[in-house]
Amino acid sequence: MTRIGLLGGSFDPVHVAHIALADTARQFLGLDQVQLIPAANPWQRQPLKASAPHRLRMLELAIAGHPALAINPVEIERGGATYTADTVRALPGGPQYFWLLGTDQLQNFCTWRDWQDIAARIELAVATRPGASIAPPAELATWLAAHRRQLHELPFAPMAVSASDIRQRLAAGAATDGLLPEPVAAYIATHHLYR
């Protein structure tokens, strides 16, 4: 059975930690592919700074040279408010899917629309600091136990990089060396994004 990882996000902009997490998940979980899913309009976040075409192009540049990474534009193509549950319901049958999330997302997972449906349809893989254990919220832990489901741990050393910090640096004209894939940094400079 094909195993596919799913990494959703605004990717505003995509940065080195996104790519490192996708590569780590592919290797550690034995995934055939990791699909990066850019949000159209994420309901729990501030409005996006870069347009969908710019974010898609930056993703294309970031995954060049990573043949097991792909872009899944389902949320952008659907438009409107972005809910993971809708994305999961639209997945084609056949593969085994793993939704990749961080410990911060795990803690608010039970606030996601139709979270039980998400957890019933796909596997959840949580990026944790090496040696740390997963501590899901009580409501999720109870649901997982009742449905004989588990969380998959994905050891991932945290990286001191965030899209919001990168946007602030770019707006201030500060350096972003090592935070962005080089082709993405060049694209941002060429198109004067985040200024």
From Swiss-Prot:
Keyword GTP-binding: no
EC nos: 2.7.7.18
Pathway: Cofactor biosynthesis; NAD(+) biosynthesis; deamido-NAD(+) from nicotinate D-ribonucleotide: step 1/1
InterPro entries to which the protein is assigned, alphabetical: Cyt_trans-like, NadD/NMNAT, Rossmann-like_a/b/a_fold
Record has Nucleotide-binding as a keyword: yes
GO molecular function: ATP binding; nicotinate-nucleotide adenylyltransferase activity
Bilayer-spanning residue ranges: none
Pfam families in the cross-refs: CTP_transf_like (PF01467)
Top EC group: transferase
Superkingdom to which the source organism belongs: Bacteria
Cited SUPFAM superfamilies: Nucleotidylyl transferase
Stretches of the chain forming a coiled coil according to its record: none
Sorted UniProt keywords: ATP-binding, NAD, Nucleotide-binding, Nucleotidyltransferase, Pyridine nucleotide biosynthesis, Transferase
Catalytic activity annotation: nicotinate beta-D-ribonucleotide + ATP + H(+) = deamido-NAD(+) + diphosphate
Single GO biological process annotation from the record: NAD biosynthetic process
Family: Belongs to the NadD family.
Role description: Catalyzes the reversible adenylation of nicotinate mononucleotide (NaMN) to nicotinic acid adenine dinucleotide (NaAD).
NCBIfam families (UniProt xref): cyt_tran_rel, nicotinate (nicotinamide) nucleotide adenylyltransferase
Protein name: Probable nicotinate-nucleotide adenylyltransferase
